[in-house]
């Protein structure tokens, strides 16, 4: 416990804040290549098979990215756009793949929240 004089001489240092998406290196998105596409099971109490992809980014770093929406066309060697955003029930998944960009197709027959899934406006 410091004395008052010690605190006057040198203020308390705040701890360094941890970055939420360090692999993007302050970019909004980064391009990457899918190394493998798999499913992961969420932690308790949820139950599902969530689609994820191991991606090597253009800066050489490898991350696990979540593939949102129903159905996808991704496979090994697909070029994808990755943005930040974690998946709460999948430990270690801190990135999302942008649907409708590069090799990742948009979600078909999507009526609501279309911009998140790259779907065009229905006629």
Curated annotation (Swiss-Prot):
The terms under GO molecular function for this entry are: rRNA binding; structural constituent of ribosome; tRNA binding
Q: Does the keyword Ribosomal protein apply?
A: yes
The protein's UniProt keywords, in alphabetical order, are:
Ribonucleoprotein, Ribosomal protein, RNA-binding, rRNA-binding, tRNA-binding
**Which InterPro entries does the record associate with it?**
NA-bd_OB-fold, Ribosomal_uS12, Ribosomal_uS12_bac
- Note the NCBIfam families from the entry: rpsL_bact
Assembly notes: Part of the 30S ribosomal subunit. Contacts proteins S8 and S17. May interact with IF1 in the 30S initiation complex.
Mind telling me what this protein is named?
Answer: Small ribosomal subunit protein uS12
């Amino acid at each position: 416990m410091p004395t008052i004089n010690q605190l006057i001489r040198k203020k308390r240092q705040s701890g360094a804040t941890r970055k939420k998406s360090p692999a993007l290196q302050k970019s909004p998105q980064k391009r990457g290549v899918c190394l493998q596409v798999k499913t992961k099971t969420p932690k308790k109490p949820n139950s599902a098979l969530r689609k994820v992809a191991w991606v090597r980014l253009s800066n050489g770093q490898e991350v696990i990215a979540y593939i949102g929406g129903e159905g996808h066309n991704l496979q090994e060697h697909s070029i994808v756009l990755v943005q930040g955003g974690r998946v709460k029930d999948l430990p270690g998944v801190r990135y999302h793949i942008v649907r409708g960009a590069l090799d990742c197709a948009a979600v078909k027959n999507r009526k609501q929240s279309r911009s998140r899934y790259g779907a065009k406006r229905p006629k």
